[in-house]
From Swiss-Prot:
Protein's UniProt name: Urease accessory protein UreD
Complexes and interactors: UreD, UreF and UreG form a complex that acts as a GTP-hydrolysis-dependent molecular chaperone, activating the urease apoprotein by helping to assemble the nickel containing metallocenter of UreC. The UreE protein probably delivers the nickel.
Function: Required for maturation of urease via the functional incorporation of the urease nickel metallocenter.
Family: Belongs to the UreD family.
Entries under InterPro entries matching the protein: UreD
Cellular location(s): Cytoplasm
Keywords assigned by UniProt, alphabetized: Chaperone, Cytoplasm, Nickel insertion
Gene: ureD
Single GO MF annotation: nickel cation binding
Amino acid sequence: MSWHAHLHLDYRQEAARSVARFRHDGPLRILQSLYPEGDAICHNVLVHPPGGLVGGDTLDIDIEAADASHGLITTPGASRFYRSEGELALQRTRIRLAKGARLEWLPLEAICYSGCRAENRLTIEAEPGAEMIGWDVTALGLPNANQPFERGTYLQHIEVPGVWLERGRIDAADHRLLQSPLGFGGHRCIASLFFVSGTPAARARREALLALARTAIDAHGLQESAGATSPHAEIVVLRVLAPVVEPAMQLLRQVWQAWRAELWQLPASSPRIWAT
């Protein structure tokens, strides 16, 4: 039996407090809103009780943030794309940010199990004055559990329409991509951290973010397989290849905290669920 679940999440500012409202259809929802940083920032945990997707499953996530609202979204655990008998497993996330909105999109990794046939799509639309920090982390198999990614396909699509597009199809049979030093070089975790602005960011602002990312990279064990660029005036990206998820996630969290301090003068404040 396949699932088609849909979540629509809205952030609004009400009496100087960012408030989340949602409606859902199927096994996809958010937990109680938390305010560890005060009323201005609403923290939410997105949960999918079945715990993963098999062939035929579809998850649709629509997020809208209104003017002056600030939401932070994470997940309690990894997303999982399991073995398919032929049908596609699909997750689509669409984020729309109104003028002056801020959003932090920080889900834990997506794990591609051997035999999966999956797509993970993220589309971001930001009006002038809106800003977002987000990341995308993909694990190909579970190397430490002796569960390699030996067959299957995974399509990864991240897009800011008219500004930035990252799209790649990973096939377990493509040994040149997976093993070549011009491809993944044997790494099994692919991760990106990105800053999206609805207004072209000043060069000095982008250079400050790049400098913070590069300083963290230079001090990290992944310095040979990580880099930061600004392909467009509205985008800054940190990309990482790692043998497993943990070191990549450590680097992303470090730079995320540095970026939110630089951009929004906010202290480090990790979602509480990460500590459980």
